[in-house]
Structures are given as C-alpha cells and as structure tokens.
Amino acid sequence: GEKAHLIFPVDKFKANTPDGKALIDAYDRLVLLEQQFMGLEKYDRMDPNHVCFSVMYNDSYMYSAANHTGYVASTMNMMCDISQFIQSIWGPAHEVGHSNQTKPGLCWHGMGEVTNNIHSLYVQTSFGNPSRLLDLYNGKTYTIYEKGLSAFFTQRRPHVVKDDKVDELNQLIPFWQLYLYTKAMGNEDFYKDLYELVRTRSDKATPGESQLEFTVLACEAAQLDLTKFFT
C-alpha cells in the first residue's frame, strides 16, 4: 500500500481476501488517520516510511516493536478479512498508536496504555464503529463511560491512580472529552496543534511536570481556559 506493508500468510489472504486492494486501502487509511490526528500532515511532518503489519508466531497477541507491529497467527483470519478487520480495528490502531506515542509530553509515566488509545478510538469511530467507551464495563450493567465519569466526578479520584476500580479505558475518557468538546466548539485541529506543541517544546524532567505541562499546552491548543476541566 501507500502507507502500510502487510506480511501475512499467503493462505490466509487466499481464504479471506477477495479484494486485496480494498484491504490494503483500509490499512492505509488507518495509518493516515493516525498521522493526520497527530498533525503530521498539517505541519508537513509526514513519515515517508511504511507501517509494517506482520504475523508473529509467539505468545504475544498484538504488540508494537521498533520496526513493526506484530499480530499472533490466530488473528490472521480477522486481519485478512476486510469486514472483520474494520469491526476489530481497535487492536491494530492501538498498536500503531503505540508506535506514534510522543514521549514524555503525551506519554508520561502511567500513560503508556492510555494515550495511544486516543488514536484507537479516533480510528474506530472514523471507520463508522460505535465508540468502545459505550461498551458495558466488564460485563456490568453500566458502560465504560459511566464507570469513568463516576470515578472522576462523583468519587473525585485522581486521574493518575489506576487500580481495580479504574483502568486504562476509564483513564482515556478525559482525553477523549477534550477532543469531543473542542470539536463541538468548532476546533477540528485540537490534537493536531497539541501534538505540535509537544513536539516543539522542551521535554519536562519528571512525569509530574509533564502532566502539568500537558494542561498548559491543552489550553494553548484549544485557545480556551480549561482550568475547571483539569481541577
């Protein structure tokens, strides 16, 4: 493809991929959506390299490495079937999101499995899927959204604290709310501009300083006073 390179078993392509062009176009779109979300296109920073999606024969389900994203052999039917791929696109988008994480400004300590999911959710919904935050929380009667909002607003739990009551998907909610709110306010470029600020400003020395700097840069990118949101 133009942006993606697939290394999957030939027999899986033969069994699941009647239209190879349509499949690679979907992978290309995944990669492009994440690059656009980060402002790489807006700020003329597009990566000329392809993102490699490769089958792996080990115990890892899916992962992101230095030069590829890997997917266990048991996922190959899904990865080669365009309908299944689009419905399950969270996983590949999550791994590409890891490759795109910008440290430490948007990936300070404790956010390794959180901020990449801003990308996952953006890609998931851009492909027309329902938001994963609307799924029921671990089979309960309430959604991930409801669980997180209860933890942060009713119980007033610190965002950084993760335990059996709050997980990475709950921690994703405030980041996604920033996207939804700024978009509703007419700012389509919030995260594009935020990523550029992170890329061009000096890194902070500690995770705590990085977290505080994020609030400052978010206000700057949104061109709004978001103090109440962060307190």
Where are these regions (language model features)?
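Active-site-proximal alpha-helical
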Residues: 143-231
